[in-house]
């Protein structure tokens, strides 16, 4: 019975993930092996969702960073639907409960390596 429940939960997670447009698969990498990011997509995000600090639709946004909801290293898309504004303090904390650590624990579970 327990195996059936576990299988059903796993199937539900995989199905939900397959339908989630924030997932794109393994990330593109540049010549140095770093994950490639699109400056055009980031600019598009900021035009659609201005900086929370100063309302700027381009340029600097003091105290805020563009964050990927599903990390690129975990198969997340480098696209507007997978981006959000996040206070820089939330991204730079060393806590084991930091957003990036939590996201990797949740999203990096299906074979997409960082």
Where are the language model's segments positioned?
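Nuclease and nuclease-like effector domains acting on nucleic acids or nucleotide cofactors
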Residues: 1-65, 70-114
């Amino acid at each position: 019975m327990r195996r059936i429940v576990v299988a059903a939960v796993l199937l539900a997670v995989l199905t939900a993930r397959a339908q989630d447009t924030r997932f794109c698969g393994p990330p593109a990498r540049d010549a140095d092996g770093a994950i490639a990011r699109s400056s055009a997509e980031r600019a598009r995000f900021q035009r659609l969702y201005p900086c929370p600090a100063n309302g700027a639709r381009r340029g600097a946004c003091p105290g805020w960073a563009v964050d990927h909801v599903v990390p690129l290293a975990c198969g997340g898309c480098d696209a507007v639907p997978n981006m959000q504004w996040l206070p820089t303090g939330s991204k730079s904390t060393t806590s084991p409960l930091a957003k990036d650590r939590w996201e990797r624990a949740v999203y990096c579970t299906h074979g997409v390596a960082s």
